[in-house]
Amino acid sequence: MSRYIPDDNLSYPVLISIGGRSGSGFYLNANDGSYLVTAKHVLFEEDLKNKKFTLWDKTVTFSSYSKDPTEKTPLVLNANLELVEVKTHPVFDIAIVKVSIFKEKTPEGMWITEFIDGITTKQIGEKHFTVGVPLNSCRKYEDIQVSNEIFVFGYPNSLGIHEKSQEDNELDYSRPLLRKGIIAGKNDLKRTIIIDCPIYQGNSGGLVMECEQVNFERKFFALGVVTKFIPFVENMKSLQYGTVNTSIENSGYGVVVPVDTILEFIQKEKQAAT
């Protein structure tokens, strides 16, 4: 029986662990190598008063599985952030970390990669390489169709009750979860995508894939990265005392930064380094 989503797509989610916290990310294959993409707030703590960002820790781990759902052991990379440069977007809540460089292609068309300085293998999984979103699977912002089906990949660690024993948990927090929704709209002024799909703590930085039906065939494209949920704000005023209580809840909508914005950012950083 075939799977609804292509097998390789299940390899894209990356669990990011840093400073006792966790978030989501994914690997993106650019022309020169593979990059870890996530939301900036997954790696950085924001000082709202001074408008400064500080890394949650000096080291971070990236954990990912292969396309085989029976795989027991993930590939875990360790990144020394004192050696590896983290680039943050000046406008969007986006951070990238270059993980490896492409050396040459095998006869089968696979890239032979080499991890850059500061990236080491902490645990070798049943797959010995990272699986990144290829460029030909990236959807441009201008081509995104409102109402199309989407899937959010990530590690929503805020769901469920964390028991002392992993066996007692309803969820396996070491594995990604998928969430299905639709493209609800586009904000052309901000150049962001609005999705009708609940986003929870831990989903930030995760990949969003768009599903398009072409001639009775499903095709999947990388849409962008989840950065936050859109809040539902309700102000309740007491008629007796005149006080106002503000309630903020998850509206079920989320914000996605398009993948071509990320690719443009990578290209600018490469040009600035030369």
Q: In which residue ranges do the predicted regions lie?
A:
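Catalytic histidine site
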Residues: 4-78, 96, 100-102, 182-186, ...
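A mid-sequence, solvent-exposed acidic-amphipathic segment
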Residues: 156-202
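Hydrophobic alpha-helical segments and helix pairs
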Residues: 77-132
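C-terminal cap/linker of serine protease catalytic domains
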Residues: 2, 219-274
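Short, charged beta-turn/beta-strand-edge "cap" motif at the junction between a beta-strand
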Residues: 43, 156-159, 214-215, 230
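Short glycine/Trp-rich loop-beta-loop segment that forms part of the substrate-binding cleft
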Residues: 119-168
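Catalytic nucleophile loop of clan PA
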Residues: 197-226
